[in-house]
């Protein structure tokens, strides 16, 4: 309903591809340097199962279970999961690293609905857990991450993804 521009919608773009003769060749794999010891140590501390392939673009580290493909002239935003950045001899994980459901985290903490609401507003949680980065979960599903000093978890959810002050988490 309302998909056409004359009906007030934005319209759609449709493209028709024509297959050229012959069989498509195998796409070349994207070469990457090996991940450093700091990143490898961090990933082993956080995950039970590590990604099979890594790609490093400047200081950004990406991970995937299938090989990265060199698309040459085709503009691709990113392949795989953005794991984080290597900054001054330390690894800083990304929010997307903790949002991937396939990863089995070693360091995670389950919270109540009230704690989830506070955390989604950007508050610090007063909760004891292991020191370092932890996946913050509700009923086993990660919704964010934080850095713990053992007694509290500092919020690392990107500010743009946090809830507004007057909004609250409701589960019916």
Predicted ranges, named:
Residues 10-12, 20-172:
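Polybasic, low-complexity RNA-engagement segments
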Residues 1-14:
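Inter-lobe coupling/hinge region of RecA-like P-loop helicase motors
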């Amino acid at each position: 309903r309302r998909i056409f521009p004359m009906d007030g919608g934005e319209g759609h773009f449709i493209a028709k591809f024509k297959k050229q003769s012959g069989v498509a060749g195998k796409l070349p794999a994207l070469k990457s340097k090996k991940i450093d010891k700091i990143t490898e140590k961090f990933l082993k501390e956080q995950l039970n199962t590590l990604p099979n392939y890594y790609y490093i673009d400047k200081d950004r580290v990406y991970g995937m279970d299938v090989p990265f493909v060199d698309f040459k002239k085709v503009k691709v935003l990113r392949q795989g999961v953005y794991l984080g950045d290597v900054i001054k001899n330390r690894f800083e994980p990304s929010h997307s690293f903790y949002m991937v459901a396939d990863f089995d985290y070693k360091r995670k903490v389950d919270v109540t609905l009230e704690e989830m609401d506070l955390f989604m507003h950007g508050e610090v949680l007063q909760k004891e857990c292991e020191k370092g980065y932890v996946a913050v979960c509700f009923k086993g599903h990660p919704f964010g991450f934080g850095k713990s000093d053992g007694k509290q978890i500092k919020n690392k959810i990107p500010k743009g993804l946090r809830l507004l002050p007057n909004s609250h988490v409701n589960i019916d």
